[in-house]
């Protein structure tokens, strides 16, 4: 079945027809052909994609990507631990909010939504606040499309003996990285992002030695990362509670398609080509990106809304949707913007078609 429109969003995103077709069969969650041949293969493939180093393992967790973030924060931190959160967007802020809900001591460095964190400030905070045990940062902050300097932040954290939690929700699978080389202790992502699966579960790739220490720490039964991992380890991929079977099977297919494309490096190149073409074309149409080019990720781009008095995002959105494209509203608190993603089953020819559709959607210039 073909889609009526292309999702130019940071996830859920447009998937291939073969990924969607993978969900047309039912699976028994007790059978080896599901647990051993799908779930366990997924777990191994994820670790291989994340790092060339040994000592890492993976665990899948039902729910949204945020559920996996909360499972990690809530299962990793001791009552005496303290979290430093780098917050330059809605998703960094969400990590701090999770810590607040769970009564976890938290300190926040917030440089603003359009600025990268100051590395000297991070080092200074870690030097003068020895209570901090963990540092959390978002890799691609889709509030704006900014790519944060995770290598530099992780290096500083490790120099101060801290554990690092990386929210790679919108980057893993689409941007090359080796979390072992970076010193990441826990990395979190989701099925419906750069791997190009469908929503339904997230996953955590962690140092085995760190995850082994998390027994009994969880503040939630459902979101107990350690118990979920132990269940999968001891029962060959079995989930503690109902497994999202159709989503899992679609994700397995998406992983195969990532390999067929040439792996993460090839997918990154496609995303980068999409984003470069998008920004060039949008500039030619009179739209200005929110961020300077050096801060852009290849995942999603924020553009300032036109200042014309007749412009309304809802009308603009509908005119694009009628032509087969769905974009995202803005999320920046201090600027009127909209966002366009270029991940998922999106290719340069799709960006070309979008730019053509844009010319017909700019109704405020046609009056």
From Swiss-Prot:
Involved in phosphonate degradation. Homodimer. Its EC number is 2.6.1.37. Belongs to the class-V pyridoxal-phosphate-dependent aminotransferase family. PhnW subfamily. Its cofactor is pyridoxal 5'-phosphate. The gene is phnW. The modification N6-(pyridoxal phosphate)lysine is found at residue 193. It is an enzyme of class 2 (transferase). It comes from the Bacteria. The keyword Transferase applies. One of its GO terms (biological process) is organic phosphonate catabolic process. The keyword Acyltransferase does not apply. This is 2-aminoethylphosphonate--pyruvate transaminase. One of its GO terms (molecular function) is 2-aminoethylphosphonate-pyruvate transaminase activity. It catalyses: (2-aminoethyl)phosphonate + pyruvate = phosphonoacetaldehyde + L-alanine. It comes from Vibrio cholerae serotype O1 (strain ATCC 39315 / El Tor Inaba N16961). PANTHER family: 2-AMINOETHYLPHOSPHONATE--PYRUVATE TRANSAMINASE (PTHR42778:SF1).
């Amino acid at each position: 079945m073909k889609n009526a429109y292309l999702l130019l969003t940071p996830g859920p995103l447009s998937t291939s027809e073969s990924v969607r077709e993978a969900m047309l069969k039912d699976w028994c969650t007790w059978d080896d052909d599901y647990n051993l041949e799908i779930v366990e293969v997924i777990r191994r493939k994820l670790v291989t994609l994340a790092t060339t180093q040994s000592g890492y393992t993976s665990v899948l967790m039902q729910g949204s990507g945020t559920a996996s973030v909360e499972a990690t924060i809530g299962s990793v931190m001791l009552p005496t631990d303290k979290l430093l959160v780098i917050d330059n967007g809605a998703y960094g802020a969400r990590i701090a909010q999770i810590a607040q809900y769970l009564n976890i001591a938290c300190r926040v460095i917030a440089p603003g939504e359009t600025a990268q964190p100051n590395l000297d400030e991070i080092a200074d905070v870690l030097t003068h606040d020895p209570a901090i045990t963990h540092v959390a940062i978002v890799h691609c902050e889709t509030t704006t499309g900014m790519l944060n300097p995770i290598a530099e932040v992780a290096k500083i954290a490790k120099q101060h003996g801290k554990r690092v939690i990386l929210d790679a929700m919108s980057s893993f699978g689409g941007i090359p990285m080796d979390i072992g080389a970076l010193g990441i202790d826990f990395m979190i992502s989701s099925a419906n992002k750069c791997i190009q699966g469908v929503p339904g579960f997230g996953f955590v790739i962690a140092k085995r030695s760190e995850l082994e220490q998390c027994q009994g720490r969880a503040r939630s039964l459902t979101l107990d990362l350690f118990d979920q991992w132990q269940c999968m380890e001891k029962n060959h991929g079995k989930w503690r509670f109902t497994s999202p079977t159709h989503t899992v099977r679609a994700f397995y297919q998406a992983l195969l398609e990532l390999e067929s494309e040439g792996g993460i490096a090839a997918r990154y190149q496609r995303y980068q080509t999409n984003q470069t073409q998008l920004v060039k074309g949008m500039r030619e149409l009179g739209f200005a990106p929110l961020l300077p080019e050096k801060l852009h990720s290849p995942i999603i781009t924020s553009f300032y809304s036109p200042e014309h008095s007749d412009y309304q995002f809802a009308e603009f959105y509908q005119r694009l949707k009628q032509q087969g494209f769905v974009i995202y509203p803005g999320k920046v608190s201090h600027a009127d913007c909209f966002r366009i993603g270029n991940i998922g089953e999106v290719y340069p020819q799709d960006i070309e078609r979008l730019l053509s559709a844009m010319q017909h959607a700019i109704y405020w210039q046609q009056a």
